[in-house]
């Protein structure tokens, strides 16, 4: 079942910001990666009910398998799932609750997503916010005090992000002409606001969602397991690369016929090609597994091919010789074009041959765009596109050495199978070594590789890989998609682009999501830097071998591989070397400047300058380290304070016990039963009585002594006062007589 979930997984849209208004929308007419074959299913009551949205065979298998597994579970499975459904209801149950709660809404309204939040009135009413195509609804039930609110999207005049108590950024305010509704306590305020804003703009522009688009958002919010049954006939599975709002156009039949005819003609013109795909299309695309297998933690590896390419060394020498000698001959060739478009772009082909069989008219554009996650590799190598394909996707010495460095083991390759839409896919199982301390030492990986039928030999290869990593933390929450794009730049130059995307089966918590993404992106960055470094070393080795060869061997090789007309001396363009100087081949010094990491989920692009992602990650790591140290210090301080408090309590209890009577004199809880026990009790009581009498005697004796001392002191005081009075009287008498 895991192999079929890719087609129903939502990809991030390039319209995830309010700045991308539907007015500025452009409808893409590029072919989708997955062929549209199969039965059609139309949403009931939709304005696009006449449009037919075909579902892929994989998606049909997914629904049938889920329904069969649901029926075959038996009573035990129903009993075991009942409690889980109560705690985590499926999308179908939520949609039924939505229709029961808001019966006044039209029957055509289908729930798209619901969020837990609170509505601010006299008090905060905790409940759930329901979003449909044309309505915003809220329901709260607090001790049987129900609150229902419905707002038509067309009636909304403003929608803003707000802060609760002017401090906490977790609120959204929706204003109509007469009312204001303040929703707060959102767990993911920005994501909720983006969804509400999209639906609001579509409602204002009167552009309803087509069935594919609606179910795309449902899958994006609820995952793949929707709990649907065969009774839900309005289900329309979205396309694999459905990532834009308003994309409801179908590709014209003429374009499909042209593509089919072109692919057929390419097959017929190549007698060595496979009946399924062009010759290089059926080669096992092995490297696709390597990058994506590093999520969510930093683990390495690369699977190995079973097939062996014979004569690989001679082919490498011939292509490298052809590259060097061909460029020298082309500098002397006449320029047939009236003008040359030279600039600082390093991706411009350097060959100017007038031969029509070399197809060097320019760089080939890939038939599919990069994924919307991050782009890790965007590099031009001095290999032909077929040679680069052989290095990366066959059992070449380069691949074996790289595998040994990445430490892969237990590799199992399943054979390629041709799908009904013309693509080819296979499953690879292998074991990787993990270095993250929070994960096990090893983990098993299941990878499903898909080579699209539009891939052509000597032109372009596009390979996608869906990677499921088991035995790692939260492995059931996410999976990864890697897209490898190999395009021809010149006859012996090709471009390798690798883009990755992290997709979620279930929406994790904020902390869990941060943990997954941190390990995922760091592992991929390390892997792809290593891959590009090894490719650059291999390229330098090939060029060095060419320079060591003799001139005669070079001449013989060049004449056998490539024949060109030598121009006359009077037809040579003057200063052609100076004109060609800006067009240079990639060097080792440029490697560090060509790997650009484009963060974000809206778009993937090539940035000409270095981004401070490494510094930012380092700063974040230092900040986390400081926070961890502060937390540890606080915990140690709390432990010390608790120990001091315990010591004081223990001393207080000990002091209290010393102030009480002897433990042996206390009345026991159990009364004496025998005469001996009574005698012991009386004896102890007598001792206690004697002790108390002795204490009182000592106290009384001490009191008597103190009283005697006090008496003596008072007598002395009295005598002193009398003597002073007598002296004063005698002095007074003397004064009288004199």
From Swiss-Prot:
Location of the GRAM domain: 96-163
One MF annotation (Gene Ontology) recorded for this entry: phosphatidylserine binding
Biased composition (Basic and acidic residues): 41-51
Chain positions with Phosphothreonine modification: 584-585, 587
Gene knockout outcome: Mice exhibit deficiency in adrenal cholesterol ester storage and steroidogenesis.
Membrane-traversing stretches: 623-643
GO biological process, alphabetically ordered: cellular response to cholesterol; cholesterol homeostasis
Superkingdom of the source species: Eukaryota
Topology of this chain in the membrane: Single-pass membrane protein
A Pfam family: GRAM
Phosphotyrosine: residues carrying this PTM: 389
Keyword Phosphoprotein part of the UniProt annotation: yes
Ranges of compositional bias, category Polar residues: 8-19, 259-268, 281-295
Keywords, sorted A to Z: Cell membrane, Endoplasmic reticulum, Lipid transport, Lipid-binding, Membrane, Phosphoprotein, Transmembrane, Transmembrane helix, Transport
GO cellular component, one term: endoplasmic reticulum membrane
Tissue/organ expression: Highly expressed in the adrenal gland (at protein level) and brain. Also found in the kidney, testis and macrophages.
Composition bias, Low complexity: 59-70
Annotated localization: Endoplasmic reticulum membrane; Cell membrane
Induction: By NR1H2/LXRB and NR1H3/LXRA.
Domain remark in the UniProt entry: GRAM domain binds phosphatidylserine in the PM and mediates protein recruitment to endoplasmic reticulum-plasma membrane contact sites (EPCS) in response to excess cholesterol in the PM. VASt (VAD1 Analog of StAR-related lipid transfer) domain, also known as ASTER (Greek for star) domain is a sterol-binding domain.
Entry protein name: Protein Aster-B
